[in-house]
Curated annotation (Swiss-Prot):
Single GO MF descriptor: ATPase activator activity
A matching Pfam family: Tfb2_C
Localization terms from the record: Nucleus
NCBIfam families according to UniProt: tfb2
Gene name, Swiss-Prot/TrEMBL: TFB2
Complexes and interactors: Component of the 7-subunit TFIIH core complex composed of XPB/SSL2, XPD/RAD3, SSL1, TFB1, TFB2, TFB4 and TFB5, which is active in NER. The core complex associates with the 3-subunit CTD-kinase module TFIIK composed of CCL1, KIN28 and TFB3 to form the 10-subunit holoenzyme (holo-TFIIH) active in transcription.
Organism annotation: Debaryomyces hansenii (strain ATCC 36239 / CBS 767 / BCRC 21394 / JCM 1990 / NBRC 0083 / IGC 2968)
Keyword DNA damage: yes
Name of the protein in question: General transcription and DNA repair factor IIH subunit TFB2
Length: 515
């Protein structure tokens, strides 16, 4: 399996693939409008906030004035997202745009507090006889979610996940086989990739598969998706009444309990509590990074005493030390973390609180054959790197910046090391990169992947037969600026653009011809 065939199951792709009529129904819910806004890139958010209180359409040419020339690629990507979601509508001439009227009205109501009382759920006004703490909710969510992951890696469990969870894992292609008799399900290639995703992506993967099954369950997919977005806007630690939910949403509660997204004292309870897994569904927070350690961080951060906080600071540290000789040491006794490491590390020795192993060509190739990518492996190692590795990396970076600045040393690209650059958010960041992992190991893992990815294919369009070199350079430079240029040959005056970029380049060529 080529590693270019990445595991894609994001909420953004799902939303963009919905019919326009379904998208319009989604925008009738203020909570959904807010959640979709949170999922947009920064420039798209800026466009929405700028046009939100405009009573007249905005000229497309004015959008260029709102962004720096260096941000044209981000502008192109943002407009592409807004068009796919039908959040912007063009007039008949194609020269002006405006926000989708339903989205505009409900998002304005959301920001001004004019939405309906139950738009974000109804808080329970009666006190609970047995109070539910945030610490308890985190513990409940951790137990539910990790039981799913442990089952996937084959850990022996006293209580296996519910049949609905097992069916979802199987229908989603994460596991295969039969769950009759002894729950004999085996993890698939997609399941291997799933394990290395961050916890938010994992949850969305299951929720989107759940959405795909709504028709078989006779459930309204819009109602289901709206409730998921409402959960992402609720307050952690608060109880909400069930009476304000629709029949479809009430029927979802049992499944959401199995995933650890909500807690109910009993099936017939008149209130439910969203867990941290639910309230961070549309959040930009990076607090929940991994299946186990990130949830443990959330658990420990809610403790109140100084002694418990000290224990939390110790447990929040990463567990993995990676040496330049490819040897790896993981200070953990978690069966789940050890099982995940075993996916791409040749483990040799196990102690009571540590495992030792080595990253080899064979272990990485086995992971690649199972559909795991080099970037996923590197990201996992960076996320779980021991705090001492991060401290040493920071010290090396500080020394390098100090040395390069004092000696006015330039980078390979010719820019001074002290030079700053602008990112997508419009803020300036240094060009230096914090290298937590040994660069030699990172490069070698990528090279082992390149051994399998010698040929890559792309869908797109070839431009050729230009009248002049000037015309070729104008179009190819524009395609490069907006990030859709895949290949160019100056001597033959040919270039190749992505499938998504053809319309933009063609429009630019038409405008040039009319001049």
């Amino acid at each position: 399996m080529s590693s270019s065939n990445l595991f894609k199951a994001t909420v953004n792709e799902h939303l963009e693939g919905l019919p326009k009529q379904v998208q319009s129904r989604l925008y009738e819910a203020p909570a959904t409008c807010l959640s979709i806004y949170r999922l947009l890139p920064p420039i798209a958010k800026f466009y929405i906030m700028t046009m939100l209180f405009y009573e007249t359409p905005v000229a497309l040419k004015d959008l260029d004035k709102w962004c720096k020339p260096t941000s044209r690629k981000f502008q192109f990507d943002s407009l592409k997202r807004l068009r796919a979601l039908h959040l912007i509508e063009e007039d008949s001439s194609g020269s002006h745009i405006r926000l989708h009227p339903t989205f505009r009205q409900n998002f304005r109501d959301c920001l001004t507090g004019s939405q309906a009382r139950n738009a974000f759920g109804n808080l329970s006004t009666t006190p609970d006889e047995q109070s539910v703490s945030i610490k308890f909710l985190d513990s409940f969510a951790l137990q539910k979610w990790e039981s799913i992951l442990h089952f996937m890696v084959g850990t022996e469990l006293s209580v296996t996940p519910s049949n609905s969870v097992l069916s979802l894992l199987k229908s989603g292609g994460l596991m295969e086989g039969t769950n009759k008799g002894g729950n004999r399900l085996n993890i698939t290639n997609s399941g291997f990739q799933f394990l290395l995703q961050d916890i938010n992506a994992q949850i969305w993967t299951l929720l989107l598969q759940y959405l795909n099954l709504t028709q078989d369950l006779n459930m309204d997919p819009v109602d289901v998706l709206n409730f998921i977005f409402i959960l992402g806007s609720l307050e952690l630690g608060k109880g909400y009444t069930v009476s304000s939910l629709s029949e479809t949403q009430i029927s979802m509660l049992a499944d959401l309990r199995d995933y650890g997204l909500i807690y109910q004292r009993s099936e017939n309870s008149e209130r439910f509590y969203p867990t941290r897994l639910a309230t961070t569904l549309t959040s930009d927070s990076a607090a929940l990074k991994s299946p186990s350690m990130a949830m443990e961080q959330a658990l420990e951060s809610t403790t109140e005493t100084e002694e418990q906080q000290n224990l939390a600071s110790n447990s929040n540290q990463g567990t993995i030390i990676l040496e330049t000789n490819f040897k790896i040491y993981a200070y953990t006794n978690s069966p789940l973390e050890i099982a995940i490491l075993n996916l791409f590390v040749h483990l040799k020795t196990r102690f009571s609180n540590m495992v030792c192993g080595q990253i080899t060509r064979e272990s990485i190739r086995n992971a690649l054959y199972n559909g795991i990518t080099a970037d996923q492996i590197i990201k996992f190692l960076e996320t779980h790197a021991h705090s001492q590795m991060k401290i040493l990396a920071k010290e090396r970076l500080d020394k390098k910046i100090e040395f390069d600045t004092s000696n006015n040393i330039n980078t390979a690209g010719g820019a001074p090391q002290s030079q700053m650059m602008t990112n997508e958010n419009g803020t300036t960041v240094a060009q230096h990169k914090l290298e937590v992992l040994p660069p030699t190991v990172v490069d070698q893992i990528k090279l082992w992947q390149l051994e399998l990815d010698r040929i890559q294919t792309f869908e797109g369009y070839l431009f050729k037969d230009f009248a002049s070199q000037q015309e070729f350079e104008a179009l190819s430079n524009y395609a490069s600026e907006i990030g859709v240029l895949l290949w160019s040959n100056k001597s033959k005056m040919k270039f190749f653009v992505t499938k998504d970029g053809i319309s933009q380049v063609a429009d630019f060529a038409s405008r040039n011809q009319r001049r």
